[in-house]
Regions:
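Nucleotide-sugar donor-binding/catalytic module of glycosyltransferases
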Residues: 1-112
C-alpha cells in the first residue's frame, strides 16, 4: 500500500517548453520531499511533452488535456488527479525556492 503524499503540486502548462524544466526542477529540489507533481499539458504544440518525458521520477505524472488553453480547467483536471492531502499550484513559467513546501508544511503542522 502506498502512502499518499502530503502535497500534490499541480502544474498546468500550455506551450511553455522553454520554462517548464526549470519549474519542475524547482519542485524536485525541495527540501521537503512528501509530494507528487501532476502536470496537465493542455494540448501544447511545442516541445512541452518532450520536456515532461525527460523526467524519470516516479513523483512526476503527466496528463494530456485539451480545452484550448483555459488554465482553470487544467487546474481542475489536476485537482481531480491529485493524491496529496493538500494541493498547491505552480504555473509552468514560475519557480519555487527550496524551502517552499517545508515552510508550508510547518505552518500546517503548527495550525492545522
Amino acid at each position: 500500500m502506498t502512502v499518499a503524499p502530503l502535497f500534490s503540486v499541480v502544474i498546468p502548462t500550455y506551450n511553455q517548453a522553454g520554462y517548464l524544466k526549470e519549474a519542475i526542477d524547482s519542485v524536485l529540489a525541495q527540501s521537503f520531499t512528501e509530494f507528487e507533481i501532476v502536470i496537465v499539458n493542455n494540448h501544447s504544440t511545442d516541445n512541452t511533452r518532450g520536456v515532461i518525458e525527460a523526467f524519470n521520477d516516479p513523483r512526476v505524472t503527466a496528463i494530456e488535456f485539451s480545452n484550448k488553453g483555459v488554465i482553470g480547467a487544467s487546474r481542475n483536471v489536476g485537482i481531480r488527479a491529485s493524491k496529496g492531502d493538500y494541493v498547491c499550484f505552480l504555473d509552468s513559467d514560475d519557480t519555487w525556492y527550496q524551502e517552499k513546501l517545508a515552510e508550508v508544511a510547518q505552518v500546517i503542522q503548527e495550525d492545522p
